[in-house]
Amino acid sequence: MKAIVTGISGQDGHYAARHLLARGFAVTGLTSDPDKIAGVQAEFGDQPVTIESFDYAAPRAIEAVIERVRPAVILNYAAKSTGTGMFDRAFEMARLNGAFVLDILEAIRAIDPTIGFCQASSAEMYGHVDTSPQDERTCFRPKSPYGAAKLYAHNLIGTYRNAYGLKCSSAILYNHESVRRTTHFVTRKIARAAAEISLARAASFSLGGLDALRDWGYAPEYAEAMVLMALSDKPADYVLATGTLTSVEQVCRICFEHVGLDFRDYLVIDPALQRPIETTNVCGDPSAIARDLGWRATTGIQDILVEMVDFDLQTLRGAPALGHTTC
């Protein structure tokens, strides 16, 4: 059995590949950065993984890859990320986060309609929320180019599933973290700061505020859910979430208490770091996927954050990094 994983050099692509390997798949992983190929390939050792450079901006180029590999499943994690500068990259975001999914769907329709395809959608599609928790029937009102492009792709998935009977599905992903996150994301930024300050490598850290609430889960578990969705004979869209909100302040407290410190002694609030257009306080209802596929998020936020801080402590002390590879 063969699988294609786009965005394999990212957090989710890595864990998805691990889950697929555990199920006996040979994986072709695509990355837009040729400089990452050797490093990503080395992480998988002698396992049946092939890493290839791919230009996601090239219209319909994915068709040739699918024709050559002939996968049983495809998982798409390729995306321009949310955050600062989104409006400056709106065209790129529309192409990669939206139109590229159309390329995949058209290729599947032409080559092999039995391919199982799971798309990484996002809770940022909800945007302005007035109900909580959100589920698969909650109205989407995105506030950003990222959310709008993801919603375009999400709607395409449903359209092609209904019109052509394709085995395609969308995972509406809420925030999901691991040691493979970059410090662009607030949980990793805080965990790294706790480790650095505890080792006297830094004196302070800055955040835009403490009040924001998020539904944070564990990335390896969410990758597993997407594999289950891609393999399902009854494709559907599902919310992947924990159903529990955690504040940025709680994240700070957990990380710093783990190293015996009070975060308030080191935090600098910088209003310039606030992101007013963000989707705020979204909390997902994962009951549908629990009912249909038996999947539930089981790793709590405290365990996730402690793993991150310990990873950074070891890295900063010069020990080998604690790469998370068990799936």
Model-assigned labels for residue ranges:
Residues 1-73:
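N-terminal Rossmann/SDR dinucleotide-binding element
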Residues 2, 300-327:
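Amphipathic terminal alpha-helices
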Residues 56-96:
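NAD(P)H-binding glycine-rich loop region in Rossmannoid oxidoreductase-like domains
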Residues 76, 102-145:
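Conserved Rossmann-fold NAD(P)-dependent oxidoreductase catalytic core, especially the SDR/UDP-sugar
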Residues 130-133, 155-230, 244-245, 252-259:
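NAD(P)-dependent short-chain dehydrogenase/reductase
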Residues 145, 149-152:
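Active-site helix of classical SDR
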Residues 190, 228-275, 286:
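Mid/C-terminal beta-alpha module of Rossmann-like enzyme folds, strongest
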Residues 219, 271-296, 315:
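Conserved C-terminal active-site "lid" loop/helix of NAD(P)H-dependent oxidoreductases
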